[in-house]
């Protein structure tokens, strides 16, 4: 019996001599243009979509990633990473307000929390993820005026103060086994779901959402150099 157990252990070592993966860490910087929209539900009030016109704005963030990468091909950059996505993100929602005849930009400085899955296939990278962004502060910008808003003042202006999102990247990535990491440049797409609700327009319901397009710069840390 003991000999059988020892033989089984030796066979296991010979059949599975390689690692299945490694810990991964990264830093990503999305730099994007955002096109916002108001989703309006009419319930007999005075809110009209004709009073607002979407305007493009700029936004970005700084996100840390940590997780585990599963090797698809030994000693080559082919693996899939499952990552926790955490950091700072600035969301902007810009409109031309024809009621006040001015451009207005709602800015939310948010804590970003989510998950991200990314595959590396040689030099080609593909990823998707989702989560929520929780605004902790922000501002309202109009007529060269910046009105700063802390969390309490944001709560006075908006209900349901969190932003569910999904995102997708596709691009190029170079990793070096000797350097223990690499860098990437990707096309970036993000959609912010219509959750944040504007106060003061009752009985109508007015929510913010946006589509974001741009690029993401990434820095990656982890090694796929293994011993056969």
What are these language model-derived features?
Residues 5-6, 22, 121, 219:
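Intrinsically disordered, low-complexity segments enriched in glycine/proline and serine/threonine
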Residues 19-21, 58, 74-76, 107, ...:
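Solvent-exposed loop and beta-edge segments used for protein-protein assembly and interaction
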Residues 29, 33, 60-147, 166, ...:
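Gram-negative (and chloroplast) outer-membrane scaffold detector with strong preference
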Residues 22, 36-42, 48-52, 158-228:
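Predominantly the C-terminal beta-signal and adjacent terminal strand-loop region
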Residues 17-78, 218-228:
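Short glycine/proline- and aromatic-enriched beta-strand/turn motifs that initiate or cap beta-hairpins
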Residues 4-13:
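Sec-dependent N-terminal signal peptides
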Residues 35-56, 88-109, 138-161, 196-207:
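Flexible, solvent-exposed loop segments that connect beta-strands
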């Amino acid at each position: 019996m003991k000999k059988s157990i020892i033989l089984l252990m030796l066979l296991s070592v010979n059949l599975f001599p390689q690692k299945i993966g490694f810990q991964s860490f990264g830093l990503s910087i999305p730099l994007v243009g955002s096109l916002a929209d108001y989703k309006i539900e009419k319930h007999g009030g005075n809110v009209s979509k004709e009073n607002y016109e979407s305007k493009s704005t700029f936004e970005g963030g700084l996100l840390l990633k940590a997780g585990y990468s599963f090797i698809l091909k030994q000693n080559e950059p082919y693996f899939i990473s499952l990552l926790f996505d955490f950091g700072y993100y600035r969301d902007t929602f810009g409109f031309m307000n024809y009621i006040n005849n001015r451009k207005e930009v709602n800015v939310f400085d948010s804590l970003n929390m989510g998950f991200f899955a990314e595959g590396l296939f040689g030099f080609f990278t593909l990823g998707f993820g989702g989560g929520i962004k929780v605004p902790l502060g922000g501002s309202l910008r109009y007529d060269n005026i910046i009105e700063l808003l802390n969390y309490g003042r944001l709560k006075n202006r908006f209900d349901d103060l969190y932003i569910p999102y999904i995102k997708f990247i596709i691009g190029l990535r170079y990793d070096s086994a000797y350097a223990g990491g690499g860098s990437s440049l990707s096309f970036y797409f993000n959609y912010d779901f219509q959750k944040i609700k504007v106060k003061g327009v009752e009985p109508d319901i007015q929510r913010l959402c946006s589509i974001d397009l741009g690029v993401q710069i990434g820095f990656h840390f982890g090694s796929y150099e293994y011993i056969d």
